[in-house]
C-alpha cells in the first residue's frame, strides 16, 4: 500500500539523435551493429516465467538486406509452451496486481531510462540488422518512440487514477482501477520495435499479465526488449514471450477461460479472424475480453490546387518510401490536381531517382530491404501487374532484386483508373500510385478518397487555402483516424498525435494516449456510508 500521493515525472518526447558524421552516437551504433552482425551464434530463447526456454526447433535469423548471412537462431515452441506461458502469467498475476501503481510505474520509467542510455545503441542496432531500418528510422522507433510510450503511459496511468467521483454528505465515493481478471494476449508486428514493446507494456503497466507472441521477423529486437524489462526489475511471469505459429498459440489462448484481452497490431484479415474466434468461444470466458487492434491502411495524400509543390513532393517521398513503405501509415495513393502535376511529377521523379538503396550500415542509404521473401514476392507481383496494365505508367522505379537482399526500388506509378488495384489494396511496400484529377473535380475527388478503400488509418491534405483545409477536414472526417494538414501521413508522436483508425483499420483505441490505457483497466466503484441507516422504513411510509 502506498504511503503518499505521488506525481509521475512529467514526460517530454525523447530528443532524436542526429547520427551526423563525427557524432558519438554514430560511432557507437555502428560499432554495436558490426559487433552484433559478426556474433553469428546468438540463440534467442522464449521467456516463460523466470526461465529461458530453448527447443530443438531452431529458426535462423538473417538481415533482410543480406539474407545469406545468419545472425543466429531463435527457438520455436508449440502448444505446451503457450500453456506454460499462460500458467506463468496467471501465477505472477496476484503479486503484480497487488503492487502499488507507482511501483509498477517505476519499473517502466527505469526501462525508459535504460533505453535512453546504455541500451540505446543495442536496440537500434538490433532493429537495423533484423528489420532493415536505416539508423534514423531505428532511432525514431526503437529508441525514441519506445521511450515515449513508457514515460507517457506512466503519466497517463496517474491521470486515470486521479479520476474520482463526487461524494455527498455522509458518503465517500471512490474508484480503484484494477487489471483485467485473467491474462492479456499480445500479438505484435515486425515493423515497429516500439509497438511490439508497447502492446505488452501498456496493459502490464495497468496491472495485467501478458502472453506475448512477437512476429518471427522481429524476434531479434524482441530479445533486447526482454533484456531491458528484466534489467528494469520487471518480475518474472508478468510478460512471457513465446515464439510459435499463430494458429497454434490462438488455439490455446482463445479457448482458455482466463483469456481477458487481445492487444493486436497486424493485418486486417488476421484481426477479423481472431475476433471471430473469440466470438465463437465467448461462453468459455470468465469475463468479456477486451479487444484492441490496429490493422491495415491504404493511406492517402490529397493535394489541392493551392498546395505548395515542394511540400507535396517532400510529403510523398517521405510518406511513401521511408522504411520501404512498410508502415501502416505509409502514403500509398495520391490525388494530384492537373494544374500542379507537371511540376510535381518533375520534382518527384528527380527525388525518387536520388534515393540510395542498400544496407543500413551505409548511412547514405534512404531505403533498405523489405522484411522477407514473402513480402518481396508479394510486392513484385504488384510491380508486374503495374508494368502489364494499360491503365498505368510507371514513372520511377519498378524493379526488384532479391539476389543478396530483398530490395525493391521506390516506385511511382500514374493511373488513369482511380479504383485500380494499387489504389485500393494495401501493398506494404515502396509503391505509390498517383491519380491526376481535373482541378474542378475537387469535391468528387474527396468522395473518391473516402470511398475507394476499406481502411481509414491516415491521410493528408496539402493546401494553402484555409477554406479548403477546413472543408476537407470536415468532409474526410471518417476517412482517417490520423489526419495531417500539409504534412506526410506518417510519424505520429506519442502524446502529440494519438495513433489509430477505424473502419477496416482497427478499433481506434489510440496508442500513445490515455484512451489506450483505459482499455486495460477494470474499474471498481466503492461507496462508503459513514453513518448507515438502522431501519428499513422510508419517510413516505409514515
Which residues does each PLM region occupy?
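Hydrophobic face of amphipathic alpha-helices that form TPR/SEL1-like repeat modules
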Residues: 1-70
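Conserved C-terminal structural/oligomerization subdomain of aldehyde/semialdehyde dehydrogenase
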Residues: 3-9, 14-18, 65-74, 91, ...
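Glycine-rich loop-to-alpha-helix module at the N-terminal edge of alpha/beta enzyme cores
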Residues: 55-56, 60-62, 67-161, 446, ...
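Residue-level signal for inorganic ion chemistry
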Residues: 68, 89, 104, 127, ...
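Short linear capping/connector segments at secondary-structure termini
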Residues: 126-133, 165-169, 362-368
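Rossmann-like NAD(P) dinucleotide-binding subdomain of oxidoreductase/dehydrogenase enzymes
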Residues: 128, 147, 157-311, 508
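Short beta-alpha connecting loops at secondary-structure transitions
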Residues: 133-134, 210-213, 237, 257, ...
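ALDH superfamily catalytic-core signature
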Residues: 228-233, 255-256, 261, 269-418, ...
